[in-house]
Every structure is written in C-alpha cells, then in structure tokens.
Amino acid sequence: MDQLEMKKLAAQAALEYVKADTIVGVGSGSTVNCFIEALGTIKNKIQGAVAASKASEELLRKQGIEVFNANDVSSLDIYVDGADEINPQKMMIKGGGAALTREKIVAALAKKFICIVDSSKQVDVLGSTFPLPVEVIPMARSQVGRKLVALGGAPEYREGVVTDNGNVILDVHNFSILNPVEMEKELNNVAGVATNGIFALRGADVVIVGTPEGAKIID
C-alpha cells in the first residue's frame, strides 16, 4: 500500500467524527485534500466548512461545500488537519504547505482537533525528520534569522513562497524540540514572527494514522 492510499484511509476514517448540521474546520495539505474529497460525499449532511488556506477553500467549493469566513463562526465542532511530524503526546510540526498561521487560527476555534496522517509522520522527538517552519513578516526576515541561529537553529529562506498572509517562511534545521510547549512560546515572542510550526499549546485530541493494516485511531 502506497502513501497516498494510507492518507486516504485516515481521511475516510475522519468522517466518523463529522456531526450533522455542523461547520467543519479544514486545514491544508495533501492528506487534507483527501479528506475534502471524502467530505464531498456527505456534503448534504453538513452546513459547510471553514478553511485554513485559499487552496483548501477552492477544493471545498469544487466539492460543492459552502465555505464560511472564520470571523463569522464563534466555534467549530471539529478541525481536521494533517501534520509534517507528530509525537506520542499528539504535538505536531506543521507548515510544510505554508498555511501554519491560518491553521492555528482555525484550530483554536475547534472543540476537537482531529489529526490525520500516514505512519511516516510519527516521530518520538519533533524536529527529527522535518525542519521547523517559521512564518515571518518580510521586513524582519534577517533579524529573525539571526535570532534563530542564536537559539541553535539553521534557518533556510523558503525561496519563492509567500503565505496567504503576505509573509515569508524560514525553515529551521537542527532543532531537536524536547520541550515543544516552551519552544512554541519562545519563538512566538520573537519580534517579527507571525507564528511557528509547533502545534503544542493546541495539540491534537485524536490522531488517525493510515497504515497498511488500516486506519489506527489514537485518542
């Protein structure tokens, strides 16, 4: 079974958490794209969705699902998103698709965060296999880069990428994130940082892992 098939298994299993007549929070990325396709099969059951990226908005509309603005929603029943890495405490690194700030905003609206991944995304320590994305206001790029170096990281400017918010991304290598909560707070306090890709303060509540044996649920 290939990686795409495992992503589809996890995405399909997430439909079990979708309640009738609710607005669903939707993240971004390849696994979420599988979820949006699956959501299209039950679109008449839900009111619509709030999306964390313009790309996800477009896919939702193609499926005939109404897209709501986050400002018009006081809370969401669930938020479904993928991850670049996830640890046993259900904390994540996200932001490979450069939508991390909006993902945090939509996740914060949700009562329950459902993370859907394939088994390759599971790690013991965050930062093991994937650099940490940091979204930065453009005028602060060099300044933030120096701060990240001082913290022991090796930031790399993600060429040609502008986020939906008009910001840039620094991918930070060499971070072994042993205390995700504290590092998330520390990096978010750096002047010029919009947010960083550690999702520890608001981690996942349920993890659905697509494996060759089927969807495995960790709650």
Swiss-Prot record:
<dbReference type="GO" id="GO:0004751">
    <property type="term" value="F:ribose-5-phosphate isomerase activity"/>
</dbReference>
<comment type="subunit">
    <text>Homodimer.</text>
</comment>
<feature type="active site" description="Proton acceptor">
    <location>
        <position position="103"/>
    </location>
</feature>
<dbReference type="InterPro" id="IPR037171">
    <property type="entry name" value="NagB/RpiA_transferase-like"/>
</dbReference>
<dbReference type="Pfam" id="PF06026">
    <property type="entry name" value="Rib_5-P_isom_A"/>
</dbReference>
<dbReference type="InterPro" id="IPR004788">
    <property type="entry name" value="Ribose5P_isomerase_type_A"/>
</dbReference>
<feature type="binding site">
    <location>
        <position position="121"/>
    </location>
    <ligand>
        <name>substrate</name>
    </ligand>
</feature>
<feature type="binding site">
    <location>
        <begin position="94"/>
        <end position="97"/>
    </location>
    <ligand>
        <name>substrate</name>
    </ligand>
</feature>
<dbReference type="GO" id="GO:0006014">
    <property type="term" value="P:D-ribose metabolic process"/>
</dbReference>
<dbReference type="GO" id="GO:0005829">
    <property type="term" value="C:cytosol"/>
</dbReference>
<feature type="binding site">
    <location>
        <begin position="28"/>
        <end position="31"/>
    </location>
    <ligand>
        <name>substrate</name>
    </ligand>
</feature>
<dbReference type="GO" id="GO:0009052">
    <property type="term" value="P:pentose-phosphate shunt, non-oxidative branch"/>
</dbReference>
<feature type="binding site">
    <location>
        <begin position="81"/>
        <end position="84"/>
    </location>
    <ligand>
        <name>substrate</name>
    </ligand>
</feature>
<protein>
    <recommendedName>
        <fullName>Ribose-5-phosphate isomerase A</fullName>
        <ecNumber>5.3.1.6</ecNumber>
    </recommendedName>
</protein>
<keyword id="KW-0413">Isomerase</keyword>
<dbReference type="InterPro" id="IPR020672">
    <property type="entry name" value="Ribose5P_isomerase_typA_subgr"/>
</dbReference>
<comment type="function">
    <text>Catalyzes the reversible conversion of ribose-5-phosphate to ribulose 5-phosphate.</text>
</comment>
<comment type="pathway">
    <text>Carbohydrate degradation; pentose phosphate pathway; D-ribose 5-phosphate from D-ribulose 5-phosphate (non-oxidative stage): step 1/1.</text>
</comment>
<comment type="similarity">
    <text>Belongs to the ribose 5-phosphate isomerase family.</text>
</comment>
